[in-house]
């Protein structure tokens, strides 16, 4: 099963996260299938690869709670609903 989850990058005390598609059994820092976004909580920046995220969601990937909140805050699901209508 696939998950969309955060992978920690950056320096000490300056965490930056990549949003990645990864197998559930892998470690947090394990090898990811694909990088689908970027999140910087310090600068409050988010960058999303929408086609890649849609692809993995259609394949059955489940976002973690934090990734779901990031996607909702970026109004990702409003875009998805408008493309489905």
Curated annotation (Swiss-Prot):
Tell me the SUPFAM superfamilies matching this sequence: Ribosomal protein S16
Please name the GO terms of the biological process aspect recorded for this protein, alphabetically. Answer: translation
Asked whether the keyword Ribonucleoprotein is assigned, the reply is yes
Q: Does the keyword Chloroplast apply?
A: yes
Family annotation (Pfam families): Ribosomal_S16
Where is this gene product found?
A: Plastid, Chloroplast
**Keywords linked to the UniProt accession:** Chloroplast, Plastid, Ribonucleoprotein, Ribosomal protein
**Alphabetized GO MF terms:** structural constituent of ribosome
| Primary localisation category | plastid
A GO term from the CC aspect = chloroplast
Q: Which HAMAP family match?
A: Ribosomal_bS16 (MF_00385)
Which family, according to UniProt?
Belongs to the bacterial ribosomal protein bS16 family.
UniProt name for this protein: Small ribosomal subunit protein bS16c
* Species assigned in the record: Triticum aestivum
Please name the taxonomic classification of the source: Eukaryota, Viridiplantae, Streptophyta, Embryophyta, Tracheophyta
